Every structure is written in structure tokens, then in C-alpha cells.
Amino acid sequence: SVGFKAGVKDYKLTYYTPDYETKDTDILAAFRVTPQPGVPPEEAGAEVAAESSTGTWTTVWTDGLTSLDRYKGRCYHIEPVAGEENQYIAYVAYPLDLFEEGSVTNMFTSIVGNVFGFKALRALRLEDLRIPTAYTKTFQGPPHGIQVERDKLNKYGRPLLGCTIKPKLGLSAKNYGRAVYECLRGGLDFTKDDENVNSQPFMRWRDRFLFCAEAIYKAQAETGEIKGHYLNATAGTCEEMIKRAVFARELGVPIIMHDYLTGGFTANTSLAHYCRDNGLLLHIHRAMHAVIDRQKNHGMHFRVLAKALRLSGGDHIHAGTVVGKLEGEREITLGFVDLLRDDFIEKDRSRGIYFTQDWVSLPGVLPVASGGIHVWHMPALTEIFGDDSVLQFGGGTLGHPWGNAPGAVANRVALEACVQARNEGRDLAREGNEIIREASKWSPEFAAACEVWKE
């Protein structure tokens, strides 16, 4: 027969290949697929593979001009999800050539760009990605990473402490700087712009940057410790964002901040490159993540967004708190926390890790625990997150009955007490409350905090 057979075709003929051996250079994806009633899982998995790589809905004659076998995504394994009706994990392998080097943007446009609106799928969620070393090596990754940050700040052997300045909107720049100074002076390492503090009429960015820099230098001089404030450089255009980063560098401050999901991966990667070139640390806030990751059966799991951030670049990223949540959440959270920090992570389905990931010396990212935590949580946080983390107490600092500086003192004393107890071999999980009670005898600020937030 001449030419090709026209017409709509079954995807699974071409894109479902259960005997495929994955290559070390393939990007692997694990999708949670919920097919429409009557659609077989193989067809659904093959549709995902096709639409996120080379496929289109009908046979086209230009297929003959390329080697589909070389460029197509392949659904190579499907397994039913235990305890769920009509839900499957579909594993898809993508050849590396489908992706532009060093572009998280292109990676996501390809893998999740189009396929989530498919008629044959009731819902679709990207659970995990395996980034091959060949692709990882095309990214710069975090501007500095955990070890370099410790060296820059001269802080070792303990988690770092932060605080988001509240009320987040409405303070003038001078009063904002004053709150920053009080927290840093009291003993915190960092204070933070709220994610929605950009440059509003009541506080323009340049004024805020100046007063915060003044607060940093004054607190440093008085405490002899290196201090920082996450100056939010997020802006309406990339040019404006870089302008703010340049001003921060000129002020000589150690760290700036970006909202990477609302700002976008392209902007974030540009900013990360600027930060490495100019010695700035980069704090990343994940505003908008729940829009993408909250639904259990549709969207994208946060561990994928976390991996993407490590490629795109950031030195800190918000990662939830675990404290007071369900036990299962804890394992899953620790799974992606390790994905952020470690060089090599073994596949472990109980922690939600679908693939073994080798980061080949890409620097690590510090996870930031923040949201509704206070001094009584300190033992649990120290135990769960370990030294390589940032613990952020917004209300847990500024809500102290005696003011911001005593609130900062309370958190620092709590942290030092927990680290000391841990180093002496005590069990923070079991003796946490006891450790807190003992230490509060030596610090009136700490005792007052314990009283306010006792459970």
C-alpha cells in the first residue's frame, strides 16, 4: 500500500510498551491516572505518554519525516493504586532529546503542559519525576547551597531561626525596619518579607530595602552575629526584579527572596544565576503551590515542584511543618525534604519517593518550616528537620506578650536548649516538654512564651 493509513488511532498501539528497558538518560515520570469509565488503563497511560511527547490525535504524514521510536514518550509500566477504585500509577519514560537543556520551563511545558485537560482522563496527577544526571548537569541549581550558606553566615551545628514580619501589609518602611531590628537583635538569624510584600503604595521597595539594611547592620554590630532579612525582589517584570536584586547587592545584604511559582520558573532561574554571580543567597517562597498540589488525584505533588526548584535554583524553600499533622504526612514531607537536601535519595514508596534520584553534586536547598509554630514545637522540629533547616516563627515571635525582641529571645533559647539536649543524647520526641520546662527557668522571656502558647 502506498502512503499511510489515515484516521484516528489507538494510542496504546504505539505508546504503551511494557517491555521497554528505561535508559539512564530518560526522564521518568510517575502519573496517578484516573481514566473515565470504560477507558482501559493501558490506553489512558499511553495517551498521557503520547500527548506529553510526540503524539497527536490522528495520523499525520509528517510522522514519516522523523523517527518516532527515537523521540516518543513511552508508558512502560502500569500498576493499580491500592485502596482506590479505578486509579493507576502510569510510569512514562521520555527521551532526553525532547527537552531543552537547563530549562525547567520547557520540561514542565512538555510533561504537564497539555495533557491534564484530556477527555479520556477523569483526573491526572504527576506524583514524581526522575531527573537523569545528564539533564541535571545542564542546570546551575541553587546559587550557593547549604554548606556555603553556613560558611557565609558562620553558623554551624543547629537549625537557623527566622521570622516573617507581621502585619504583613500596612506598615511603613521605617516601622517595618524597626520590627526587623528587634527580632534580629533578640537572637534570630533571619527575618522575612511576607510573600505578598512587593512594592505597594504604603511601602515602596527601595525604602523597605534601606531600612531593613540599617536594621541588619545595627543588629550585627550589637550581637556580633551575621544577620539577614529576606528582601522580596519579586516584581511585575523580570527587569524590575533584577533591578531590586542589584540594589540589595549594593546595600551589601546577604540574602534576597523570590516567589518562584507566581514569579515563574524563567524569572526564578535568571534570579538564581544573578545571585550566584553576585554572592547573594536566595530564599524561595512557594506561594500558589496549593493551587497545584492540594488535590490528591489531580495536579502535581509538591515533591515535583521541590525538585524543579532545586534545578531552577534557590537556597531555602518553604516545605510545610509536619508538627501536629498526621503521622503519614510526616514521612511524605521528610521524603521531599531529603530530596531537597541530600545528594542521593533511594526509591522509597512509603515516603512517596517513586524513583531513586542522584543529584550529582548539585548543591542542596534548606527546607523552611513555617506556619503556626511556637516554642513548644521546638523539640519536635529540631528532631524532625535536623540541623539543616530554617525554622520560622512569625506569630510565634511577634505574638510574645512583651514584644518582638523578647519573642526572638524565647525562640533562640528554646532552640539552643533543644540542640544541647539532643547533643547530650536525650530523646527530644519523648522528653521534649520536659526539656522546654527546664530551660524556661533560666529565661524569663522564654517562660512567658511557654505560658502564652501552652497547649
UniProtKB/Swiss-Prot annotation:
Going by the UniProt record, its keywords in alphabetical order are: Calvin cycle, Carbon dioxide fixation, Chloroplast, Disulfide bond, Lyase, Magnesium, Metal-binding, Methylation, Monooxygenase, Oxidoreductase, Photorespiration, Photosynthesis, Plastid
Annotated coiled-coil positions are: none
InterPro entries xref list: RuBisCO (IPR033966), RuBisCo_large_chain_AS (IPR020878), RuBisCO_lsu_C (IPR000685), RuBisCO_lsu_C_sf (IPR036376), RuBisCO_lsu_fd_N (IPR017443), RuBisCO_lsu_N_sf (IPR036422), RuBisCO_lsuI (IPR020888)
GO CC annotation, single: chloroplast
**Which residues does the annotation list for site: Transition state stabilizer?**
K325
GO BP of this protein? photorespiration; reductive pentose-phosphate cycle
The principal location of this protein is: plastid
Q: Name one GO molecular function term.
A: monooxygenase activity
Q: Where in the cell is it found?
A: Plastid, Chloroplast
> Reaction catalysed?
2 (2R)-3-phosphoglycerate + 2 H(+) = D-ribulose 1,5-bisphosphate + CO2 + H2O; D-ribulose 1,5-bisphosphate + O2 = 2-phosphoglycolate + (2R)-3-phosphoglycerate + 2 H(+)
**Binding annotation for substrate:** N114, T164, K168, R286, H318, S370
Q: Which residues carry this modification: N6-carboxylysine?
A: K192
| One Pfam family from the record | RuBisCO_large_N
Any extra detail in the entry?
Answer: The basic functional RuBisCO is composed of a large chain homodimer in a 'head-to-tail' conformation. In form I RuBisCO this homodimer is arranged in a barrel-like tetramer with the small subunits forming a tetrameric 'cap' on each end of the 'barrel'.
Know the name of this protein? Ribulose bisphosphate carboxylase large chain
- Protein encoded by which gene: rbcL
